[in-house]
C-alpha cells in the first residue's frame, strides 16, 4: 500500500545527517552529464562499457572510471558474460528517480515551448 504524500513527507522529514549526506553524494555523482548519460544508457537492456562509450562519445577509459564510481554508489550493477561485462541500472528505485527527473525536465521544456508560442 502506497503512503500518502503527507505520510511520506513526515517519514523523510527528519532524516539524519549521514543519510542526507549520502543522498547529496548521489546527486553530486548524477550532476556530471557523462555519468548521468551512463546511468540513462543502463536503464534498458544490459549494455557494455564499450557500447556506452560509443553512444555517449566519450573515451572507454573515462567510461570505465565513471562506471566504477556509479557501481560503488549502487546506481549501476554489472554482470559478466564471457569476456564482457554488461551494466544495468541497479534497481527500480534508480530507474524511477531517473524517469522522474527526465519527466520533470521535459515538463518544464514543454511549458517553455507553450509560453513561447
For each of these PLM feature ranges, what is it?
Residues 1, 58-61, 75:
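Intrinsic disorder/low-complexity segments
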Residues 54, 65, 71-72:
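Alpha-helical residues within the helix-turn-helix
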Residues 1-22, 93-117:
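Amphipathic alpha-helical dimerization/coiled-coil segments
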Residues 17-61, 85-93:
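N-terminal helix-turn-helix DNA-binding core of bacterial DNA-binding proteins
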Residues 31, 63-66, 101:
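Generic structural signal for conserved hydrophobic packing positions in ordered secondary structure
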Residues 71-81, 88:
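Beta-hairpin "wing" of winged helix-turn-helix
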Residues 69-70, 88, 112, 116:
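Alpha-helical and His/Cys-centered functional microenvironments
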Amino acid at each position: 500500500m502506497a503512503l500518502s504524500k503527507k505520510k511520506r513527507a513526515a517519514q523523510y522529514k527528519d532524516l539524519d545527517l549521514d543519510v542526507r549526506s549520502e543522498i547529496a553524494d548521489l546527486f553530486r555523482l548524477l550532476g556530471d552529464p557523462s555519468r548521468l548519460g551512463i546511468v540513462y544508457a543502463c536503464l534498458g537492456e544490459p549494455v557494455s562499457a564499450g557500447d556506452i562509450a560509443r553512444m555517449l562519445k566519450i573515451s572507454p577509459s573515462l567510461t570505465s572510471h565513471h562506471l566504477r564510481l556509479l557501481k560503488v554508489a549502487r546506481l549501476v550493477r554489472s554482470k559478466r558474460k564471457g569476456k564482457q561485462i554488461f551494466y544495468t541500472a541497479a534497481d527500480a528505485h534508480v530507474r524511477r528517480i531517473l524517469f522522474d527527473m527526465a519527466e520533470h525536465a521535459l515538463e518544464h521544456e514543454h511549458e517553455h515551448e507553450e509560453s513561447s508560442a
